[in-house]
């Protein structure tokens, strides 16, 4: 069996996340259907992560196996002809049999976008915030995350994870324009709902509703209910996956 990686992007607006759902369309299902139709054999794909409903990916990776050689360039071309317009394949290429889209990934990067003034052209992919936010304080709080190992406070309740340990290597708010910012965070792995919960809690810091000391206490508590609200999914992008 030969193993192949597919690198692609998608607009998650009309999907119930990456993973196949019993009642709702998913990106995984669309990719599997297209591959199976083109290759004329039942194909299963494994993704680098599981984005939630409405979340987007600028660069996602998935792998599949097939027992014959394929023309990767031609397959990528055919996939782009067959897939919906909100999914784009960048490339298909062979990898070693032990390469795994999820478990071989060493770094994942997410961006969360916000804007602080009404803008009809940002509303679909950015969260509108009507607060006067202290981004310097938010970046002080964000930098503390680089010293944290247990992110249980930002894990969706009742998630079936074996560990809540993550190694965050970057967490910073970046200005994109006069009234636009994004939060960039990179780690070896992420918990379910983690990025949106982190952003929601940092917003509380930016509104001066949490002090830096209280933010550290929230992180240390391991209690999801003590952290901020989960932010909307439409402003979250999986930016990149490294191997």
Where are these regions (language model features)?
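Structured-RNA-binding interfaces characteristic of tRNA pseudouridine synthases
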Residues: 1-243
């Amino acid at each position: 069996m030969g193993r192949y990686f597919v690198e692609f992007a998608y607009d998650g607006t009309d999907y119930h996340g990456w993973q196949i759902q019993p009642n709702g369309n998913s990106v995984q299902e669309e990719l599997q259907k297209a591959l199976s139709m083109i290759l004329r054999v039942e194909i299963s794909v494994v993704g680098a992560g599981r984005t939630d409903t409405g979340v987007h990916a600028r660069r996602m990776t998935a792998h599949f196996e097939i027992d014959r050689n394929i023309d990767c360039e031609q397959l990528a071309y055919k996939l782009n002809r067959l897939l919906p317009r909100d999914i784009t394949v960048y490339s298909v290429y062979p990898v070693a049999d032990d390469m795994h889209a999820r478990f071989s990934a060493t770094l994942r990067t997410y961006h969360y976008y916000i804007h602080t003034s009404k803008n009809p052209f940002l509303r679909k992919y950015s969260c509108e915030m009507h607060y006067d936010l202290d981004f310097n304080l938010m970046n002080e709080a964000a930098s503390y995350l680089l010293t944290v190992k247990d992110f249980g406070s930002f894990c969706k309740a009742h998630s079936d994870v074996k560990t809540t340990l993550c190694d965050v290597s970057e967490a910073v708010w970046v200005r994109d324009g006069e009234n636009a910012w994004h939060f960039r965070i990179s780690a070896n792995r992420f918990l379910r709902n983690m990025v949106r919960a982190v952003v929601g809690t940092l917003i509380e810091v930016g509104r001066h509703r949490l002090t830096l000391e209280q933010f550290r206490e929230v992180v240390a508590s391991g209690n999801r209910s003590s952290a901020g609200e989960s932010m909307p999914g439409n402003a979250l992008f999986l930016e990149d996956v490294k191997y």
